[in-house]
Regions:
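Hydrophobic helical h-region of N-terminal Sec-dependent signal peptides
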Residues: 8-12, 16
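Cyclophilin-like peptidyl-prolyl cis-trans isomerases
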Residues: 3, 10, 20-229
């Protein structure tokens, strides 16, 4: 199958859209592991952030923490069989301004062992892989389908399997740049407070603000996010 048919045959995975789209930009890298406390109206969540595996993503998140961007935001999207998402809207469901988005690091993070498993933190984005800014989500189940799709060696790629179909002799650049293959960048993991995540996960949802569904009927407030180390 030729490359144009491959791209046409693929469906775009954009279920974790932030509703924002900006040109990509890079942020300074940092090293090591940081720890943050996410204080919510349902309790505290602590998480490790892996700057050694997703440096731009962690630096971006910590800059928002330093700017107190997350203080007073809500978990605006809760799907009990999927994830809980927040970091972009205030308690009145007004979208907060953000800095320019960051370069996607999902493949780098995946190669370093970070996958969308239960309890991990990942960046939300639009259909553009390089559109993540402030919004993040916590996986409440294993979501392997959100992981970046590995690209086999070779150019053209002799054989590539995707969504149950096999494609042959596909130009490598078409696969590397195909938006639907990027997945979502994991950058941290909950180390304590999964019981709080479970409470958020279980909260009743419905329509709210600009959203037709999946909004907690009782707002789940992010009171603050604090860097512990």
């Amino acid at each position: 199958m030729n490359t144009s048919r491959f791209i046409a045959a693929c469906t775009l995975l954009a279920s974790l859209s932030t509703g924002l789209l900006f040109p990509p930009s890079a942020h300074a890298q940092s090293n090591g592991i940081s720890k943050v406390r996410i204080s919510t109206s349902m309790g505290d969540i602590e998480a490790e952030l892996y700057a050694d595996k997703a440096p731009r993503t962690v630096a971006n998140f910590l800059q928002y923490v330093n700017d107190k961007h997350y203080d007073g935001t809500v978990f605006h999207r809760v799907i009990s069989s999927f994830m809980v998402q927040g970091g972009g809207y205030d308690a009145k469901y007004q979208q907060k301004p953000t800095r320019a988005p960051i370069e996607h690091e999902g493949r780098k993070a995946l190669a370093a062992g970070l996958k969308n498993t239960t309890g991990t933190l990942a960046m939300a984005r639009t259909g553009d892989p390089h559109s993540a800014s402030s919004q993040f989500f916590i996986n409440v189940v294993d979501n392997a389908f959100l992981d970046p799709t590995p690209i086999p060696d070779g150019d053209p790629v002799a054989k590539f399997e995707y969504q149950g179909r096999v494609y042959e002799n596909v130009a490598r650049s078409q696969l590397v740049n195909a938006p639907q293959l990027f997945g979502y960048t994991v950058f941290g993991k909950v180390t304590s407070g999964m019981d709080v995540v479970q409470k958020i996960r279980s909260t009743p949802t419905g329509a709210g603000g600009p959203f037709p569904s999946d909004v907690p009927k009782t707002p789940v407030l992010i009171q603050s996010v604090t860097l512990l180390k």
